Amino acid sequence: MYAIIKHSGKQYKVSVGDELKLDHFEAESKASIEVSEVLAINDKELKVGAPFVAGAKVVLEVINHGKDKKVVIYKKRRRKDSKLKRGFRRQFTRVVVKDIKA
């Protein structure tokens, strides 16, 4: 059994027990989150929503929050003695799929 969910503008294919790294959102650790934006669900037969499957929910549990590795952005303009170096660390929320309700 799997489901395709939409969270913060991105789509994820999930099954029970899967661990996901989603974009950061405000929630406490060990909190349960219900996602009702289920695009498709496969439980013996495939149900595709228009745009969402009616009555379907996916229950997620927040494990922790964190930051990815730093991405360094470096720009250099040749012969101009001009350069720019910046770093960026994306924040994420790690969740585990507890239940899929059809």
Curated annotation (Swiss-Prot):
Keywords: Ribonucleoprotein, Ribosomal protein, RNA-binding, rRNA-binding. The lineage of its organism: Bacteria, Pseudomonadati, Campylobacterota, Epsilonproteobacteria, Campylobacterales. GO terms for molecular function: rRNA binding; structural constituent of ribosome. Belongs to the bacterial ribosomal protein bL21 family. It comes from the Bacteria. This is Large ribosomal subunit protein bL21. It holds the Pfam family Ribosomal_L21p. This protein binds to 23S rRNA in the presence of protein L20. GO terms for cellular component: cytoplasm; ribonucleoprotein complex; ribosome. The keyword Nucleus does not apply. The gene is rplU. InterPro entries: bL21-like, bL21-like_sf, Ribosomal_bL21, Ribosomal_bL21_CS. One of its GO terms (biological process) is translation.
